Structures are given as structure tokens and as C-alpha cells.
């Protein structure tokens, strides 16, 4: 296979995986520390994309739109935690699933009332609209390289924050033994609010960065939420390292299989059948990967230390 095509698909997989990491990192922290299943996590990603598109369209500044999306969605996430989700901590997981599913419907309707049914456009910054020549003959969009760089920087910042700071120590203590951490003076309620706000901010960052590549529309968070759950199952619940490894695995497997499978099937079947069957099999491969990890290591590849 052509080297340029392989390199492009690897970069696409890296970019997709790092965007999944932004969603999965917040989700795995909420699930691992707060022991809460939040189905509305994808809705915060959608809100972030809408805020970025709206503010960017009004001001003409992509950076300002992205900043407003991150700040606004973080505040929304903390308000939701304080007003609604805090009441669910002592409930069973079924109650959490039902309540956060209702929250999905409410947020979808709220977005529809504010911005309408039609998708919003979020334009790529003019300075990043062209390609960059990485190697002779290998051109890659500058904006996608920005996404990769931001994803790597966020991953590094999260690792440093969780492992090298006092707040990170509180987060790890809350994940290991909530009652003991509270007995030692950690304000668990405030910690939960901060963690949920951080998860919402990461969702908004992913939504704002992916807005120029995808349609900003109602319901855009549901499909990517499923992939985020797959990531944390593969990587290990509560583990930032696991979320990063799982995201990269899912991103690379999904991107590579969508390119390689149709080409491989054309050698065995008609082009029409290969074109229709290839993408379907590529989607299944992610769940085959998850099933294999669950069979081999039910706790995930890098589970959080308890």
C-alpha cells in the first residue's frame, strides 16, 4: 500500500483517538471517582460545539468561540452537578441512567429552542485552512495537526495534574476510598463539582475542535458517547492512562479498518458488495476489540489503582 495513504490514515486515527480521549477522560473520572453513570456526557459535547459555533459566528473569532464554549460548558456542568446530579450519588445505577437520559432529552430540546433545527456552521480558522507538507509528497491539513497537538497537550496536562498536584492527590484519594478521603478532610462535594466541571470543559473542547469537521446539530453527542464508553471499558474505568490508550486504539482501529477492509474485500467480492460491507464490518471491529479486552482483562488494560 502507498506510504502516503498509510501515513494519512495513521494521522487521521491519531486525531480521532485524541478527540475521543477528551470525552473519555472526563467520563472515566466521573465514573471512576463519583461512581456515577452519566449518559448526558455527550450532550455537554454538543452544547460545547453549539456555543463555539454561535460565539465564533457572532464575533468572527474561532479562538474566542472555543474559549467561550469551554468556560460556558464547564459552568453548565457544575450547575447540573450542584442542582441535579448530586441528588443521584446515593441512588443505584438504574436511577442514574434514567435521570441522565431524561437530561439528554431536556438538553436536546433546550438547544433546539435556542438555535433551531438547522445545523450551525463552524468555519476553520483562515490561518489553518490549508495543508502542511510533513514529508515530500505527504500533505496533511494544518487544522487536523492542531487538533492532534491540542489533544497531546491536554493528555500531558491531565497526567501532570492527576499525578503531581495536590488536587490530583485528592482525586486519586477520592477514587480509591471516598470515605477515608472525607475523614482525612477532603471536601468530597467540592471535589465532585470540580471533577464534573473539568469533564464538561473537556467535552466542550472536543466539540469546539470537531465543529469545523462535523455538522453541529442536535443529537450529535449520542453516537460519540457510545464510543467514549467503549474507550473506558477497554482502557479501565477511572484511569487517565487507560483512557488515552483506549482512545488511540479505537481511533486507529476504526480509521484503518474503514480504509483497509473495503480494499481487502474487493479481492474476494464484487466492488459493490465490498463498498457496502466494508464500512459495516469496520464499525463492528471496535466492539470485537472491546469484547476481546473484556475476555482477556475484564478490568481493562490499565485499571485505576485502588
Predicted features and spans:
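Membrane-interfacial amphipathic/re-entrant helices at transmembrane-helix boundaries
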Residues: 1-22, 51, 59-65, 91-96, ...
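Membrane-embedded helix boundary and interhelical linker motif in transport proteins
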Residues: 11, 33-79, 83, 261-274
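Hydrophobic core segments of alpha-helical transmembrane domains in multi-pass membrane transport
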Residues: 49-54, 70-76, 103-111, 150-159, ...
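Transmembrane alpha-helical segments in multi-pass inner-membrane proteins
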Residues: 60-71, 193-203, 207-208, 213-287
